[in-house]
Structure formats: structure tokens, C-alpha cells
Design a protein with these regions (language model features):
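Active-site pocket-lining segments that scaffold enzyme catalytic pockets across diverse folds
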Residues: 119-143, 149-165
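Short catalytic-site patches enriched in acidic/histidine residues
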Residues: 1, 106-111, 149-203
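A composition/biophysics-driven feature that prefers long, compositionally simple stretches
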Residues: 1-136
């Protein structure tokens, strides 16, 4: 969650301006999940780390939204990118995915844009770190690009650079001889001599 500084799936942040509280919503990992993921921070530990007012289980999110809707309060959300988030917004607010782009809050969009134009020292450190990793990703791709190597091999090595530095790719790596196709995914085709190859990658 960008505003909460937490990197874990299955969390929702609700900033309730009217009631002056910040909710961290999600479920604690149970014993069956620990077998798969190992020990992780509890919801309370994450709440303390990010400074949220309180935590609630995920089942409470619908109630939080319903209470706000019943009082005719405006619920602000950004235009969703992922399909699972579009479905979640539809379930919570009744806004169909086709209508979500225009229903998104322009007030919140402008606030986010304004806030993101100013960086704290920690954010600048992360940006500089990502730039160094991105440089290594691109120079690795340049070094490996030669006839007979597959697009998938090079893109796999490029992704591995990000992971080896404890980062993740900022988007699926684009590495293709078909640069005319936007967001072209790497294939098992071998690189051919004299062909132009497009690489777009980042951490």
C-alpha cells in the first residue's frame, strides 16, 4: 500500500477523513499460510509500523463501505488498473468496471499527482536504487543480445537481475524483435542477425 508503506498482498487502506482515522484492513496469516510463507508480521505489527489508527479483518471492508454509502458520503478511489481490483470495487461500491474510470475521484487523482511531485529523502534513495538496478538490467540485455539467443532467455536474465537485488520488476519486461507491437511479450524466437530488438525493463 503506497500511502501506508506496506508491501504485502491482501491489504486495503481506508483513509476516513470525516472520522479522522486510518484503517488497515486485512487478515492475519493463519497456521496453514505460515507453512507456505513462513513467519510474517501480524496486522497489529503492521499497524504500528505504518501508524494506522486501527486494524479490521477483510470481512469488515464491506461494512465500512456500506456505512459510508448509507450516509451519502463520497468514497474516493483512483482509476483501477488490475482486474481483481475492478471486481472488488464493483462488489464494494456497485460501480461497474466499465464506469470506474469516469467514476474515479478527480480530487484524489490531483492530490496524488501533487503529492508524488515532492519526494522525501527516503523516496529519492529508492528511486536512485531502482535506477542503478534498471541500468544493470539494460546493460545485461545489451551484453546477452546476439543471434541464436531466444527473447525469453534474455528477458529471464533481465528479470533475474531485479530479483537478485531484492527488487521486483516494475512491469512485465518487454524484450522483442517486434517493436511495432506495444507491450510485446518475449517469445521463444531466436534473435536474428540484422534485426532490431526492443528492450523496456525496470525495477
Amino acid at each position: 500500500l503506497y500511502y501506508y508503506g506496506l508491501q504485502r498482498d491482501g491489504l486495503v487502506g481506508v483513509i476516513d477523513v470525516d472520522n479522522d482515522k486510518d484503517l488497515l484492513i486485512g487478515n492475519d496469516i493463519d497456521i496453514e499460510d505460515i507453512v507456505w510463507y513462513g513467519s510474517v508480521d501480524s496486522m497489529e505489527e503492521m499497524r504500528q509500523r505504518c501508524g494506522a489508527s486501527e486494524t479490521l479483518p477483510m470481512r469488515a471492508l464491506k461494512t465500512v463501505c456500506n456505512e459510508a454509502l448509507s450516509k451519502h458520503r463520497k468514497i474516493h478511489f483512483l482509476p483501477p488498473y488490475r482486474h481483481d481490483i475492478k471486481i472488488q470495487i464493483f462488489d464494494l461500491l456497485g460501480v461497474h468496471p466499465i464506469q470506474q474510470k469516469e467514476a474515479a475521484s478527480m480530487t484524489l487523482i490531483k492530490a496524488v499527482v501533487k503529492m508524488r511531485s515532492v519526494k522525501e529523502p527516503q523516496e529519492i534513495e529508492e528511486l536512485e536504487r531502482a535506477a542503478v538496478i534498471g541500468y544493470k538490467m539494460h546493460t545485461t540485455a545489451m551484453r546477452l543480445t546476439k543471434p541464436g539467443v531466444t527473447e525469453k532467455f534474455v528477458s529471464g536474465q533481465v528479470d533475474g537481475i531485479a530479483h537478485s537485488y531484492g527488487a521486483m520488476v516494475s512491469f512485465p519486461t518487454i524484450y522483442t524483435q517486434h517493436g511495432e507491437i506495444l507491450h510485446g511479450a518475449p517469445s521463444m524466437k531466436e534473435l536474428e542477425a540484422g534485426r532490431l530488438v526492443l528492450c523496456d525493463a525496470g525495477a
